[in-house]
Amino acid sequence: MAELNCQFVRPDGLMFDGPVDHLILVTYAGELGVWTGHAAEIVALGDGVVRTTALQSDGGHEYDVVVSGGYAEIDDDGVIILADHARRVDDIDPDKVRETRELALEHLDQVEEGDHRRAYYESKVRWCNLLLKQVTKGSASGQR
């Protein structure tokens, strides 16, 4: 069986590098399934979950990665994902995310309109909200 080489990179380094059966990317245009033999393409990543399925020889398990922004470069036998933000759903600590969100909101309240730091804290709050949404969705529906 053909395999798809996948590299998943975020700003702090390489998150994953190895073969997968297929993956479903979240893009601004919707979801995009990628299997071996896919046409060459570069897509902008949206906010949501990239769903990855391991090779059957590796157990065929699925794992989800929450992403926000970035790009994916696809060719016939591989995909390189360069995500602005990325975290495996299994690695999300809801209490830590809530704490980070509260701190960002406190800082946001202290920053005046027009201050360049405002965009940073707003982005941090959006990222935390996205993480919490996925944790809530996963526990409510019993996903993966």
Residue ranges and their predicted role:
Residues 1, 9, 64, 113-114:
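Short linear sequence motifs
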